[in-house]
Swiss-Prot record:
Gene: pgi
Active-site positions on this chain: 359, 390, 518
One GO cellular component term: cytosol
CDD domains to which the protein is assigned, alphabetical: SIS_PGI_1, SIS_PGI_2
Record EC number: 5.3.1.9
Protein name, per record: Glucose-6-phosphate isomerase
Organism of origin: Pseudomonas savastanoi pv. phaseolicola (strain 1448A / Race 6)
Amino acid sequence: MAYYRNPSDVTALPAWQALSKHRQSMQNFSMREAFNSDPQRFSQFTLSSAGLFLDYSKNLITTETRDLLVSLAGEVNLKDAIKAQYDGELVNSSEGRPALHTALRRPVGDKLKVNGVDVMPDVHRVLNQMTELVGRIHDGLWRGYTEKPITDVVNIGIGGSFLGPELVSEALVAYAHKGVRCHYLANIDGSEFHELSMKIRAETTLFIVSSKSFNTLETLKNAQAARAWYLAQGGSEVELHRHFIAVSSNNAAAVAFGIREENIFPMWDWVGGRYSLWSAIGLPIALAIGMSNFKELLSGAYTMDQHFQSAPFEQNMPVLLALLGVWYGNFWNAQSHAILPYDHYLRNITKHLQQLDMESNGKSVRQDGTPTSTDTGPVIWGGVGANGQHAYHQLLHQGTQMIPADFIVPIVSFNPVADHHQWLYANCLSQSQALMMGKTRAEAEAELREKGMSEEEVQKLAPHKVIPGNRPSNTLVVERISPRRLGALVAMYEHKVFVQSVIWGTNAFDQWGVELGKEMGKAVYQRLTGGTEEPADDASTQGLINYFRGRHRG
């Protein structure tokens, strides 16, 4: 029976039981000692694929640990689950849908049927539609209501319609097409729209309304605000089609808004929002970096797809990262995972991975509706590495929690300034080294004595200088951030998330927890605005409504 119809209780599997025993034997394992005793440790725990180099040697593992984790992947029938996803089976069981974002990066000539229909011709038809639009805008042929060419593109969308495209377009700014600036409008907070409107001119701005339903509250409100602003700036209803296009599956709503049918790019229900940057949702990416670079992004992701499908689990980058996450979350009680990019242009990768991981694996029931038998997804957090060193790295080094970390760093900078990049790279490596090695009490005391401190001062200060070490991390190195390598990197994390969902038996492709707050928000809005006098279901919410109504003017 398919894994998603009958998920395993993973804790009952022999490999899980063996890992539990193995964890006890690893209680006093020291990474520092492991490196000292095994000169081959680095080569044993590194691999490369799709332009990415992974060093996972700074983890609380031995070859036995890896073997047991790989056995666990085998016992949950991971290979069958991967095939089921790529074949278009209904792996999103709660919504009765496939999860085929991987189809968006498959080459021309591939065939893939959904409900008996080959979807690949449609995928490439939309890519061609994107190519035509991007070419017209970049060549100055798409003009606004005053016949001036488009200079600014504003993507109106939230969640997956925003985080992935923003990450990629900013990460690849070195590849940006000159003459077109891309902006993102996501938050329903009017201040965001106000600040954006100060940077653009209506006559040369194209708005992309990205919403599968064309009914997402934040997106629709911002689209309406943009429409009103456009009209107030001198635009007309007749020329609205020059300034608004859509990515949506609700053509009727988009047309009613004023968007022409030929300017609506389709979405499919087998692509989830957080996996959608490869689709027409990636239109702002293509407008930012050009269609040829967008296709390179797809190609890099496809290369990682092939690696994921074919590499043995012990040499499979996303599988190994997923298994390490399970190892720490379920056997070492780690509750969070830090993403630390040492690259300014990758500053938004943590936000994208937060949604990708936490919306996918923030689940407490298995695919069949039964409760999970173990903890699932961790909190994903972090930020630009060098800045983080002067903020939260203190907790990573000396805090009481174990927080595994991923360091991501390029070898080559697009903007070399003196020896800045050498220092940046050195800081990345030294942080992972310090997490692993730490500083013993004896080392702290010796260091203080060398500074000429009295023995009383040494004994007083030494405890504060001790760094426990033995804190796990992975280091991902790329030669430079290119479309192809970035595509592979993002796809790798997508696959990592899926693997963990298979192990836990959860559905990585729904997000029912998001819906409840949305529905309640409508009722709260009615009470705030006087649409109903019926009190809220709890005194706290009603009290806050009353506080707002008593003070708000506007």
